[in-house]
Amino acid sequence: MVLMIIKGIFRRYEKWNPVHPTYGAFWGMGIGIGCGVGWGPGFGPEVIGYVGAGCGVGFSVGITLAGLGIGLPTNFLLAAPYNTVEATRKGAFNFFGKNLSTNGWSDLMPQIAGLQRQVSEICSGFNKKPHLNNAIDLKSFPLFISHDCGKFGSHLLHVRKGSEDNKSSAM
């Protein structure tokens, strides 16, 4: 009797929702002991090969031998990583591609100087606005940096005063 009630609930659920309950063996990464999200031979009401998420016997990273979960259509889940890669590629092209294609390295150097200035300001605790319009805004990223790195960063980011003179006099 209970089994028939559960089957009836699943049938009604299938009619309006494209995401179906699945069961089977899944592989992927997860958090916890035996819980994970992965893909594999999940057998849903309509198709084989849905993506499943669930808890079962297995490892937090590895194979879940048996589990229950919710299956999602695979083309939806394959689109998310593709969109992430595309956004990253376009962002990298906007940063490097524009500058390198127009004037070579000459336009990239002010951005590197602005990046160095912002790292130094973040580490030392100053809240100055960057002088360059094209510089990367590091303050928009969540960073947790101690105040001691200001001293360390200033040694790394500033050129030693005698280094340029020594190179020109050696030639």
From Swiss-Prot:
InterPro entries: AS8-like (IPR037735)
Upregulation: By cadmium.
Alphabetic keyword roster: Cadmium
Domain of life: Eukaryota
Matching PANTHER family: CADMIUM-INDUCED PROTEIN AS8
Protein name per Swiss-Prot or TrEMBL: Cadmium-induced protein AS8
Species the sequence originates in: Arabidopsis thaliana
Organism ancestry: Eukaryota, Viridiplantae, Streptophyta, Embryophyta, Tracheophyta
